[in-house]
Amino acid sequence: MRPIRAQLAMLWLAGACSHGAPAARGPALAVRTEITEAETAEKARRHDLARVHYQRAIAAARDPDSIAFARHEYAETLVTWGEAPEARAQLEIAAAANPGDASVWHDLGILRHDAGDDPGAIQALGHAEQLAPNDARPRTALAALYWRRGDKANAAREYRGMLELELPERLRAKVEWALAELAKP
């Protein structure tokens, strides 16, 4: 696994483990059922069958919540299969269907960065941060992206913003370390 793939997988897993609050209406029952079947097939390592169920969920999705849910769930699995470009396309559709879903924007930002689209990644991660200001994930990703690009001022701004959040002590220590490193000439 290439180092960027390892980083992407870690960031993706962090994002996948903590979705934002579900929408008021939520996805349709038929869509949820197909996603459940897809996940069951995936756990049995029946990727071919999982793909069929994800595609059925997408076909059954008629309302914005269902469209966003089906496409986001499929995108998460596509990443694990190494199909990042298709995952990114699914997330673009999910974001258009439900532009208020911070987790979709976060994941889209990560995949845009992986594809070399840093301006698009910054836009998506910034949108996720605006939608979920108390979520450290978009700030963490933005700070790392800015730092990698050599933009120490914006990286430090994101890390300072994280210190205003309720963080686990271990993460707080890492943020303080990052700020100290960024302050060095």
Residue map of PLM features:
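Canonical tetratricopeptide repeat
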Residues: 70-73, 107, 141, 174-178
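Terminal, low-structured helical/coil segments at or just beyond the last alpha-helical repeat
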Residues: 21-23, 153-185
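Register position in tetratricopeptide repeats
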Residues: 43-44, 80-81, 114-115, 148-149, ...
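Structural marker of alpha-solenoid helical repeat scaffolds
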Residues: 60-63, 97, 131, 165
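Helix-start (N-cap) detector for alpha-helical repeat units in TPR-like alpha-solenoids
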Residues: 31, 65-68, 102-103, 136-137, ...
